[in-house]
From Swiss-Prot:
This is Cyclic GMP-AMP synthase-like receptor. It is an enzyme of class 2 (transferase). Residues 95-138, 150-185, 204-228 have a biased composition (Basic and acidic residues). Nucleotidyltransferase that catalyzes the formation of cyclic UMP-AMP (2',3'-cUAMP) from ATP and UTP and plays a key role in innate immunity. Acts as a key sensor of double-stranded DNA (dsDNA), the presence of dsDNA in the cytoplasm being a danger signal that triggers the immune responses. Directly binds dsDNA, activating the nucleotidyltransferase activity, leading to synthesis of 2',3'-cUAMP, a second messenger that binds to and activates Sting, thereby triggering the immune response via activation of the NF-kappa-B transcription factor. Residues 26-48, 77-229 are annotated as: Disordered. InterPro entries: Mab-21-like_nuc_Trfase (IPR046903), Mab-21_HhH/H2TH-like (IPR046906), MAB21L/cGLR (IPR024810), Znf_C2H2_type (IPR013087). Belongs to the mab-21 family. Mg(2+) binds at residues 307, 309, 409. Coiled coil: none annotated. The keyword Coiled coil does not apply.
Amino acid sequence: MVIKCPNCDKNDFKSVRGLNCHISRIHPSSADGRGLRPSTDTRGRRDDKDIVVKDITCPFCDKNDFKSERGLSCHITRMHRSSSDGKGPRPSTGTRDRKDDRDGARPETLTPRHEDHERHNSDRDVVKGIAKVQRDSLQKGSPDNILLKDGARPETLTPRHEDHERHNSDRDVVKGVAKVQRESLQRGSPGNILLKNDAVGAKPESRPAKYKESPKQSRTTEEPHDRPLSSLSNFILSFNAPNFEKFVKMIEGSIVRPREDSTLRTESVNKFIDDLKVVMERISDIPLKLLKSGSYYDKTKIDYNNEFDFMFYADIKMEADFTNCPPGYCKIRKGVTVNKDLDPFIDRNGYLVPKLYKSHMFDIFEKCRTDPSFRKGRRTQLQDRKPESPAYTLLFDLGIPDKSPIDIDLVPAIRISGWPKTKDAREIQTGKWIDISTAKKAMECFHVVTKQFPEAHPDTNLLWRVSFSHAEKELILHADLSDKGCRKNVFKILKKIKENMKSKNPTEMDKFCSYHLKMFILGFYDTHSDFSKDQKLDMLKKGIEQLAKCVREGAIENYFIPKDNVLQSVPEEERRYVVRELEGLLQ
């Protein structure tokens, strides 16, 4: 039996359902209601349930480069909205060219940089609006409103019913689309917001319509252009994800960085440090060596490479004295050496005074930065830091338009060979995730920095803060070496969550930092064995729960010196805020 379309004479249908789908999609009701409008240049599909149109032409403006019926539907809705007199669509004027077939008119206030963001978000809202209208139609139970999943109509419908159903369906879709667009413009589409990271190629992700806003969050969306500039993920995570898995995907998506920009920044900083070392060898009266530390070098960077840490330590043999020192601190005295370069900074008892050493090292850094032969130093600016800060911080301008400057911390330090000779320090144990070679290399040395002890102590002026930057770097860098698991990924997600909490309310979160997370995560690795990639979500949930518990109790052990509570400097009010945010993620 030959099944033939009465409008375009197409006769290669395999069933009546295929013909019905063809008629409803290719020959929708005309605006005047007198019958069906013929369509041309169609081709058969692989089955009778899925009809693909080869050339789809707009009946109002003859635009014919649509890729799908959805593109045509969105085009008609946006470009040829129904007139107020009810006589049918009217052509739209004054619109500009779009990149996408589905693009519609945008508010005249949008700039070209905003268009791509707003266009994507608006298209997504349109699709969801159409789906909602169709679901509502099914819930009403009216046979005239029924639309099957594959586009076919029930065989019990008569042609008269089909025309009426098509008319109602088209009208409901147009109304639904218009409503979605109005709501999107009223609440401030994410596409209208220009984020700080746009300068380096970052694009904001659209906000799904089903995400609910809390009253506090909704206030930040009323005036989108007045929102404080922040990272991409801070905007995304201001809305509640429908489930934990999607929340994690949103976090991971926000961690991705453009490789080209990352390489540019890293190469620029490495060149800066290489040139600085050349100048330093000529100016410094102390032999210095370099340790590259920080998240970039242990491969856990979560944002753009805009912060780098470098330790410069005297290449002189020194010894650590832990006698009568609080956990995590020690005194430094001269070892067996004939070098006298540090003698001016040693007191009468033979101990190296942190403040004197720090002041002298800062002078060396400043002389090198301002030396005429150091050209890159001309693009730096000294940043103000708190007196107790152990770092000499520079703001390094890349000299490239639209590229933000980089924070570079130069930290004076002393290197001590071997592992701390104190019962308070725990040796790194091999086993679950640490192999012998990693443990051996991590315990080769440790460092001390000029960070002052926050409490009263008889030897306050002689205390140095013990730093395990070398060991931390080795352990984190090789965390997944044994089983190719997800340890580093869990750590990076926790760091991103912490950054989002800080950006959300920077006034309430000042002391809690990545160092606290690092001490927590190393202990977490020891207490959990299965970090296979398919356990990532489960491990992340357990990590958030355990972290919230530790912060609530006000105690996170220093992984290397268990008696040292690294949270002791974090105020109770700030800890309560962190706990509240962490527990909110699991709800």
